[in-house]
Amino acid sequence: TDVTYKILQDIDDWQNRPLDEIYPIMFIDAVHFSVREDNRIKKLAAYVILAITLDGRKDVISLQIGENESSKYWLGVLNELKNRGVKDVMIICADGLTGIKEAIGTAFPDTEYQRCIVHQVRNTLKYVPYKDMKAFAADLKTIYLAPSEEQGRAQLERVTEKWEPKYPNAMKSWIQNWDVISPIFKFSNDVRKVIYTTNAIESLNSTYKKLNRQ
């Protein structure tokens, strides 16, 4: 219908609109949802890219439906942003999406890749029962709120030594992913607060989930 065509045209215009040349921070996150296709329920992921502009505004600049994460997939997404005018991004903050680190290194070699701290904490607490969750979360906070990487690393060793005998798998990802967790210590306190609080993109994702349920 004409209405459908108009909506699809508007979506296409939005997905291809020109972007700013420079963004201080971009967040990439996935919203998982279910769709019915051929009388079957299919799981899909919508990848949302939320950018913080130079004047502090939040702007959703891309929404992609993806099935197969890979460095090739993410390189295509990032190159699309470049084709729309993006020349430089200071920090890209994302969870451990398959291939994202390699793609960022190719498309934006000067950009700092930062593992999402909120996701990192949540994934860790999955290994911890409710009775210890509050104390464990407080200990994790001493790592990412430390004033320097050296002190953060010392706290990482302390927390691991304290909890590893009880929950041997909980801290493994912090040790294995320290190279992409630790960039946060390079930034000012204001930038760090933006990175370890994902309210902006999480509220957006909860809205998408509500719309999907309708």
Language-model features, listed with the residues they occupy:
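RNase H-like nuclease fold core
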Residues: 2-93, 98, 102, 107-110, ...
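Short, well-ordered loop/turn and helix-capping segments at boundaries between secondary-structure elements
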Residues: 83, 106, 130, 206, ...
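Inter-helix linker motif
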Residues: 109-126
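Generic structural signal for alpha-helix starts
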Residues: 129-130, 188
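A polyampholytic, Gly/Pro-enriched intrinsically disordered region
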Residues: 131-148
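Acidic/histidine-rich catalytic cores and adjacent linkers
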Residues: 145-214
